[in-house]
Amino acid sequence: TFEINAMDTFQTFLNACRNGQKSIVKILLERGGIDLNRRDAEGNTALHYACREGYRDLAVLLLEKGADASSANNRGETPLHAAARKGNREILARLLDAGADPDVADREGCTPLMRLVENRRTDAALWLIDSGADTEATDQTGHRALDYATAHGLTEVVARLSQNGSDATDSRDAEGNTPLHQAVYNDQAEVVRTLLAASKAQLDAPNDAGETPLLVACGRGNLHIARMLLDAGADANRPLTNGTTPLHGAAQAGNRFLVEALLGAGAAVDARNGVGETALLVAARAGNNEVVRLLVERHAEVNAANNLQHTALYYAGERGFTEIVELLLAAGAER
């Protein structure tokens, strides 16, 4: 016999669903008196728990017994959102068959597709896209499914969404970042490759801060991605609104090979930023010996002064960078 206090029945039922105990769920349903769509304190129903844990047979049983496929919890999550955690395609299909809206947004504006991508459920995400999910929907911060795929490095999903949405690769988030910006920010080289293959339209597009994807890559010192962007035709001299060029960013990051790649792509060695600094001055002040050495070899103007009339030699001396001081003096820097 299965003795249970009537008051505890609902909690026992929920726990059984949470733990995938289908036989106990069946017994309780046969006894009757269970409200299938009753919510707990967080607003979750039994179906939410079965879907969240990926219990396919249990989810099917609950749906057959009349569970509401569209019930939202306190966070606005439906069973479809819950199913995105494990990404069981059969559960997703059953929920859609039962009338669940594939594009319903939770409190954060996220659709089930976004949650699938966030949980790196590539196969299920591709399936939902093929099932007609809205790929252009945005969450509360202006991000689309493509942005999520970019951030999490799901190249197959990025490729599918780039094919699907005509303007997918041109989309912007709240800070004006394109998917290409986001891939670069997250050091997702394969996603960058996929996006470049889909479209080069946004190659030199600035975000709201004026950064192009190349400027971001150089600021992060990411040589691999910077080379990919340069090979695709990115402008090596496109500056920020304050005059900072990719070369300034690479010099600050201290990546000699990145500086070399930019110079090879036509970056102006003596370009000045808004306060009159050249890349040499930036590198000297940061103590980046190898970058200073390379810039001197490439005939950077060693006596170039910024708006304060300070030179690379001034900053290297002030900060005690002896090797840089010697390099600059040997190249003809004036004390």
Question: What do the predicted segments below correspond to?
Answer:
Residues E136-T150, L154-L161, N307-R335:
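Leucine-rich solenoid repeat scaffolds
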Residues F2-E30, A41-N44, A159, Q163, ...:
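Intrinsically disordered, low-complexity regulatory segments in ankyrin-centric signaling systems
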Residues N15-G20, Y49-Y55, A82-N88, R115-R121, ...:
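Ankyrin repeat A-helix N-terminal signature
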Residues E118, D139-H152, N164-A168, D173-N177, ...:
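Solenoidal tandem-repeat scaffolds enriched in leucines and small polar residues
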Residues L36, A69, P102, T135, ...:
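Ankyrin-repeat inter-repeat connecting loop/turn
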